[in-house]
Amino acid sequence: MTFNSSLSRRRLLGLAGTAAAAAAVGRFAWAADPHAHAGHAAPAQSFALDAKGWALPAPRKLKLATNLNAICLAPVAVADSQGFFRNHNLEVEFVNFGHSTEVLLESLATGKADAATGMALRWLKALEQGFDVKLTAGTHGGCLRLIAQENGPRRFEELKGKTIGVTDMASPDKNFFSLMLKRHGVDPVRDVNWRTYPIDLLGTALEKGEIQAASGSDPMMYRLRNQPGKRELSTNLVEEYANLSCCVVGVGGNLVRKEKPVAAAVTHAILQAHAWAAQHPETVAQDFLKFAVNTNSEEIHAILNEHTHAHYSVGKAFVDEIAVYARDLKAVEVLRASTDPRKFAESIHADVFS
């Protein structure tokens, strides 16, 4: 594995439904875990031995764009040291990406990067613009939080007429909690004020009463929740969304069309890494320290335990998840009114395992 920062430093609900997908199921190890999300694969002891089913016949160099500082993506960052990429015959060069989502997706569409990981709720609006990028899998759930003062609002309904602090008006957390507000009868466009702050000032804004809730992602929101006088109003692991993936794998359209086995190999390696991380969070936490800044292994371990790294989605199940997000993003005026959620989800998906 090599590391590249040339692009700057700013970030299977199951194989089912078709005969081809059914044939592929045998190459994934399924667990009889009663706590696994319905239809999702969960890690099994044999899962780590499954790489040969998707390993390439010869070594292939590949550029993977990701945010190496995002704790929820720690399994991706340590996939190399644990041999997941190597077992798939992949020689991965990490590109620590911090540009805008549009620049990231353009890098995939133009071949500057082969694959990337990121948050669905940040990517979908950009993908609506027509980038030649395909999503291949959802990797896990969790990592978005809405925080309030202990004596502040306790339900979404109580946020009507209030102000919510965010770091970015196009952030995945703003999009997600807009969906939740809408589900609870609060119009996120007209009934709520959104105000931007640097992430390290959200707590101060709460304490001063400038905002009544703060929205963001881990690790900062995990830390904010644990401060005295703060409480978690919600996360993205609630209601219908509890069983959905928040982060996804994307690949360039050209890679899917010309080298589908490569797209399958990198996707499978990443899914393996997340499943393995669910069983070995302590090891992942230690390994991730070489990438992370301003954290420690105990915090990384604790945050990983609150995410759902044992659950992922591919194929039709993944399309179903994206369609749910697309439907609800359309309802809160993020996606165009003319967008058909199901057709949109199908158009940006590639079933690399069929």
Please report, for each region that a protein language model flagged, where it lies by residue.
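Secondary-structure end/capping motifs
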Residues: 257-336
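Phosphate-coordinating loops and pocket residues in cytosolic domains that bind phosphorylated ligands
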Residues: 14, 161, 226
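Conserved C-terminal helix/tail region of periplasmic/extracytoplasmic solute-binding proteins
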Residues: 38-40, 329-354
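Short, glycine-/small- and polar/acidic-enriched structural segments
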Residues: 34-189, 195-196, 205, 212-218, ...
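Pocket-lining segment of extracytoplasmic ligand-binding domains
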Residues: 121, 200-290
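Short, hydrophobic secondary-structure boundary micro-motifs
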Residues: 88, 135, 285-287, 337-339
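N-terminal secretory signal peptides
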Residues: 1-11, 16-24, 30-36
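Sec/Tat-exported extracytoplasmic proteins
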Residues: 83, 88-89, 112, 117, ...
